[in-house]
């Protein structure tokens, strides 16, 4: 189901005019793709606890969780986070019903080395990234979900599964603004508003810094930018 939602949501963001931006050539000044990939099996070395503490005083009850996938080809979907209770709750519409769930504080890394955004099929990594992480209009979303549903059926998924995935995908992408462009990091960067994750493009790959320490998103973004810069500094 996660794969289906990813595909559906990627289609919902890919409409609109094609970008004419050129890829940045001098990537050594803003991050090194090869170096980033070298850390795909050691997220905790790419952003170690002592570096996080330079920018944020983690409480004693913060717990580290490293979700390490055994399959080598899936390390770009690993997660490494420090979490602790916040007392906050978030609301989410899921399958037509509104649900409330705990929203703990968290700081860490996700999806280091991911190139999922390249499924856009555009000429350059930057164009793919901008096409994948963009705010689509309601009309674009509806057309994209229709196209994605047809492709899922072509791949052999049954109608009920496609209907469920489409419904969930529409719920998750219901807000008009779900991405916020962030300047000055990597070749491009975007804040994923719902997920509280800063995704940074480096060459043909990316990494995500997850930060949720406040209801004020500007505080979350400010810390995420500092931690992302630490990653880029390590991989100059």
Cite the ranges covered by each PLM segment.
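Generic structural signal for hydrophobic residues
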Residues: 47-48, 52, 227
